[in-house]
Amino acid sequence: QGSWRATFTGYDAEYKTKGTHPIGGALALLWHAEAGPVFAATMNKYQLIEAPNMQGSTRKYLMGGTPRIELIEDGNVYTNLDDLNTDIVCHIDKNNYCFQVNTHLVDISQKSPSGGEVPVVVNYVYSEQGVRICVRHCPDRAYLVLPIIASPVETVEISSKAMRINRNNGVLNVKCEAGTVEVGPTDDDGRIFNPVPGFSFVPLRILPDSEDKKVLINIYFY
């Protein structure tokens, strides 16, 4: 829409090696004509499945670069990125492209956390102004992960409600309308680098901070 381009994954099949390609209604790519790439999907878990054509990572931290809902329990990671039982509904409303993703938090073996099935509804709205991501009720202990692509040489400003990146004579804004912004662990340069697709990013976590557990994010560039 306008200067924005995006790709969703709606796969319902797995590769032989589990936990590789994102599925589950993931936002696999977000790109802006002036700002360039904002999100670019990675393997869910970096594995050298084509070792001669891939490089290992020597950095301290390595995590996936795909936006997701995440819950960690007893060291196990549960996200929407491996859910084979996801439904995506799309409609157009006043020239806005609206996607509703009905998904679940599972591990790479399709198992739910100990408390049982964890359904999640994520809404995406694309307009000429930008992109809105909304989780009306984030499950207990879960949060939204937004790995924002940012070169280590770019100037980044982060608060509990926003992130700003000076880029290409403009500013990429990530504004948190509901929830609280935190930054996950990074290497010394303040970034996570993932060899596939080869981007550095800042791992934002958006935690619900209200009784209704709503998370709402607006992304725009000016």
Predicted regions and their residues:
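Extended polysaccharide-engagement surfaces of secreted carbohydrate-active enzymes
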Residues: 1-154, 158-168
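Beta-strand-rich recognition/accessory modules
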Residues: 168, 175-222
